[in-house]
Structures are given as structure tokens and as C-alpha cells.
């Protein structure tokens, strides 16, 4: 992962308003950030932001009231030693939180070493929580997939398939039936948690849907505010195919999945043919997926019913289990 764009300046710009940050000194060190090794070795964003801790030198160090009080109780010699050790570790930047006054020696050393020093009236815990969430978002695995991403019955559904199969037309039909558009053509996905992938629309394509023969349609203007969504969690992939290939199964015994950013996402395959109402089929697939998420598997229930019928000697469907 390229971490060159993640530095003190970018983090300050993105969080200054939210965290009420002020840049006290060390402006020359605006390019300070995280090394690739530090990010690669971090198990989570918690490894990159935390309370003052000299054991983890390469993370963002936050000094709250407890840390400042501890510093004030030290002897001059211990203060100087701790400050020298802290600055020598070259953290990306320091934050003095809780409205506490930054110790003069800390300000002096940050100025001399070009170490960015921020201050904020917010508590250290609030600053750490916010920065951890921010870091987890910008460092999360990302991917851009081709397709139409929709909110169907509250579920994030990605329509995929070869060009010319009518994905955008199908998306338009589903939007006209009351569902919402997230993104068309290019969808930005990011894995923000261990069990979900979130999809958004690139800013350039916001609210737009391209339909052959009609060109670009502004869905928000045509259908209203409720016809578009800012983001959705990806739960289902619907692949459109022109004709079934050798792997197509009429009644798949096992659920199909597609790996997206290391997370298995449920997948259904629908054949595109004349006379088929694809919008109804997609809605049915979504409803069936919702049932499966609730533990209701229609195919498994039918197989159990069939097995019981074959085992019943009085059944009109006698058979022998293999």
C-alpha cells in the first residue's frame, strides 16, 4: 500500500474541523507519516494511534491530562530525558489533548526537530477514537468493480455481466420500481470491517446512470432524492449471462460466492433471454437471499421433505436413498 500521501498535513486537513485541531509548531515536518513497514505490521488502526507510549514510537502519540500531569511531577532531568527520547523516536506528529497547555520544553524540541505538534480542547480518548476510525478508513483494502450497484429492499446488490447485456437498463427498471442507485459502471468498494464491504460511487459519476440510446441520466433529478443512495454494504452479486456455460446449475446444491477484498459475497447467476422479466427475478433473488441470511433455505427444506417422503413406506413417492 502506498502511504506517501498519508502525512501530518493530510491528516490535519481532514480532521482539523472535527477534532478542533490547532497546529502549534513543527510546520516544516508536514510530510511526516507512516512507513510502509509500520502500516504492513499494524494489525489494526489501534497500532497507529494511541496514548503516549515510548514502546510504540512510530504511531501518533496523544498526550492527555494524565500524561501532562505525570510529566509535571517529574524532575527536570527526567523531563528532559523523556522529551529527548520521545522526539528521537520520530513519531508522525504529537497531539496535546484535553485543552492542556503544551509543556514549553516539548514545544521547543518539536520546533527544533520539525516534529508537528497539534493541540485540541477535546479529550484524549475522543481524539484517539476519531483518529483510529479515520486511519482504518483510509488504510482499508480497496477495489473498483464494474457493474451497477443498487439498494434493493435494503440490501446492497451489484449487477455484473458482459457489456451489452442490459445491466443499466435493468438498473433503470429496478429504480423505477422504487429501489435506489448507488453507482453505475464503476463502483468503489472498501473493506471497513472484518465482515462487511462497503460500496460507494466515485464523485465524478455521482447520481448518473448511462443507458444505451438515452445517454447519461441524472437519477436524482429524474426520480427524486429517494432514488439515490450514498453508500451500501455489498451483500449480493447478481451475474447476468447470455447463455449458461458448462458450470451453470439449475438447482445449485451449494451457495455460490465471489471473493471481494477477501470476503465471500453471495452470488446468483441469471440468464438473459427474450421474455424474461429480469427485474422480478432480481427482486426474487434478493428476497431469497434475505431468507437465507435468516437461516431459511428453501432448497434444503425441499430436500429434507423429499428424503422423508422417500423413507415413508406409505408415501406415493416411494424410493430408495442412495
UniProtKB/Swiss-Prot annotation:
Residues reported in the UniProt entry to bind Mg(2+): 168, 210
InterPro entries found in the cross-reference section: HPr(Ser)_kin/Pase, Hpr_kin/Pase_C, Hpr_kin/Pase_Hpr_N, P-loop_NTPase, Ser_kin/Pase_Hpr-like_N_sf
Domain of life of the source: Bacteria
Stated role: Catalyzes the ATP- as well as the pyrophosphate-dependent phosphorylation of a specific serine residue in HPr, a phosphocarrier protein of the phosphoenolpyruvate-dependent sugar phosphotransferase system (PTS). HprK/P also catalyzes the pyrophosphate-producing, inorganic phosphate-dependent dephosphorylation (phosphorolysis) of seryl-phosphorylated HPr (P-Ser-HPr).
Family designation: Belongs to the HPrK/P family.
PANTHER family: HPR KINASE_PHOSPHORYLASE (PTHR30305:SF1), PROTEIN YJDM-RELATED (PTHR30305)
Name by which UniProt lists this protein: HPr kinase/phosphorylase
Encoding gene (name): hprK
